[in-house]
Design a protein with these regions (language model features):
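Structural motif
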Residues: 28-39
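A short, solvent-exposed beta-strand micro-motif common in secreted/extracellular proteins
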Residues: 76-89
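Short amphipathic beta-strand segments in non-cytosolic proteins
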Residues: 42-62
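Sec-dependent N-terminal signal peptides
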Residues: 4-13
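Extracellular beta-sheet/turn segments enriched in Thr/Pro/Gly and aliphatic residues
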Residues: 97-114
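Sec/Tat signal peptide C-region and signal peptidase I cleavage site
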Residues: 13-19
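Glycine-centered loop-to-beta-strand initiation motif
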Residues: 64-72
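Short strand-edge motifs at loop-to-beta-strand transitions and within beta-strands
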Residues: 60, 70, 107-109
Length: 114
């Protein structure tokens, strides 16, 4: 009976640890040329140059919140090309690519639009 209880106890820890695995995520903060956060900026992520150039087939997209932040959850652990835009400002000319994301981690980056 003691062995069965021990086995059940150990297997329950295994189930809990598998359920707590962190999925790869990316938190982007969009700032203007003065360093202020930008609310309402449109952000798109692309995996390849062709899609980035044509602005089609974004793997994820959204709009920044009032703190200039957007979160992408459960995404691939790859390098992304980014377009961030609000009005006549965007990130072209710099900061267009994010290095490979670390798998099963909370990744962060800042994009500057001007």
């Amino acid at each position: 009976m003691k062995k069965i209880f021990t086995l059940l106890l150990l297997s329950s820890f295994t189930l809990v640890s598998e359920a707590q695995i962190i999925k790869t995520s990316l938190t982007l903060t969009v700032r203007d040329e003065l360093g202020n956060t930008v609310e309402g900026a449109t952000v798109m992520l692309f995996e390849n140059d062709a899609d980035y150039a044509s602005e089609k087939n974004a793997v994820a997209e959204g709009i920044t919140d009032k703190k200039g932040v957007i979160k992408f959850k459960d995404i691939k652990s790859v390098s992304f090309l980014v377009i961030a835009r609000k009005g006549d400002k965007d990130n072209s000319g710099g900061g267009e690519q994010i290095g490979k994301l670390e798998a099963n981690k909370f990744n962060k980056a800042t994009i500057v639009i001007q």
